Regions:
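ATP-binding N-lobe of GHMP and related small-molecule kinases
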Residues: 1-110, 128-133, 173, 182-185
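Residue-level signal for inorganic ion chemistry
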Residues: 13, 41-43, 81, 115, ...
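DPxDG-like acidic metal-binding loop motif
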Residues: 81, 110-136, 151, 155
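Phosphate-handling active-site elements
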Residues: 89-101, 125-145, 276-289
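Conserved, helical-rich catalytic subdomain that frames metal- and/or nucleotide-binding sites
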Residues: 154, 159-260, 275-288, 294-322
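N-terminal pre-core extensions flanking Radical SAM catalytic domains
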Residues: 263-277
Length: 322
């Protein structure tokens, strides 16, 4: 029986790319939301002991899932779960071996944060097995693994800044049906940043304080309307220009009734917010043969916190409609 955490996907409801930093990263400002599409990450074995060297051997196996083949073909050192485990043990002064198993359902390289969410789950599991860090230190550790990992440790609705390490959780919910279109296109994130051409002195045109207030109003009222006019993704125009199929999928969601549709992250997935599952079914039919449509919903901060508690189980995660 393994300790298991559900690792939720995310979408960027809003993503501004700000100035390029001296460390080569970019500052961003984003409204993120967790969705029920998820992987499951299990810590099957952990043989750890104090050590000055802090070296650890990591094994990762696939438990299947719609994207399980990715785990099978990826060396542990290239998987963010493996990187998270190695960093955790080095910082905690632990050596030995750990073994993870992942049921992979979140498309890879699609702007849905699957790898980061898996890494966040691995950090939680390791810290529960070998308590070493408080929440703040675990967030700092996560930022060294990947820019989205601090958010994935928090989940739900949140505003993120810096390069992603500054996370402000938001209360409330948006009771929409969410349709995700997996376009099956790999978009190079580094290339997308280069195409934006942000300089070190670039400043955002958005009034951030007003935006934050409108986000809170939207989540409190349960509708995207208060903030919809300010939402954007700075990558969307350049990526859609390079890959017309992504723009076509987004536009198809709008035509099928989405109250808001956009690209998430640097692509290639797009999402739509719908009033009913029937509208998502219509989008699935319209895109049949060209892209996969996943029906899901938002995950609140409370739901994410509850899932972060480990459960001893070998059960498969419930499926999300495709």
């Amino acid at each position: 029986m393994a300790d298991t955490i559900r690792a939720y996907a995310k979408i960027n409801l809003h993503l501004e790319v700000l100035n390029r930093r001296d460390d080569g990263y970019h500052n961003i400002f984003s409204l993120l939301a967790g969705i029920a599409l998820s992987d499951s990450v299990s810590l099957e074995e952990a043989d750890l002991r104090p050590s000055r060297e802090g070296g650890v051997e990591v094994a990762i196996r696939s438990l299947g899932g719609s994207c399980g083949h990715v785990i099978e073909s990826m060396p542990p050192a290239d998987n963010l779960v493996g990187k998270a485990a190695i960093l955790f043990c080095r910082k905690a002064g632990l050596s030995g071996s750990v073994s993870f198993a992942i049921e992979k359902n979140i498309p890879v390289g699609a702007g849905l944060g699957g790898g980061s969410s898996d890494a966040a789950a691995a950090l939680r599991l390791l810290n529960q097995t070998a308590p070493s860090f408080d929440d703040q230190d675990l967030m700092a550790l996560g930022s060294c693994v990947g820019s989205d990992v601090p958010y994935c440790l928090t989940g739900g609705f949140a505003l993120c800044a810096g390069r992603g390490e500054i996370v402000r959780p938001l209360r409330g919910d948006l009771p929409y049906e969410v349709g995700i279109v997996d376009c099956g296109i790999h978009v190079d994130t580094g290339g997308a940043y280069r195409l934006l051409g942000r300089s070190v002195d670039y400043q955002t045109p958005n009034a951030l304080t007003m935006f934050e207030q409108l986000c809170e109003q939207a989540l409190f009222s349960g509708t995207i309307e208060p903030v919809r006019g300010m939402l954007r993704n700075d990558f969307e125009d350049i990526v859609c220009g390079a890959y017309p199929a992504i723009a076509a999928a987004r536009d198809r969601l709008k035509a099928c009734g989405a109250v808001y549709a956009a690209m998430t992250g640097s692509g290639s997935s797009v999402f739509g917010l719908f009033s009913s599952s029937a509208e998502i079914d219509a989008a699935r039919e319209a895109l049949r043969g060209t892209a996969r449509v996943i029906a899901t919903r938002f995950v609140s901060n409370r739901m994410h916190a509850e899932s972060a508690a480990t459960r001893r189980s070998t059960e498969r995660m419930p499926d999300v409609a495709h």
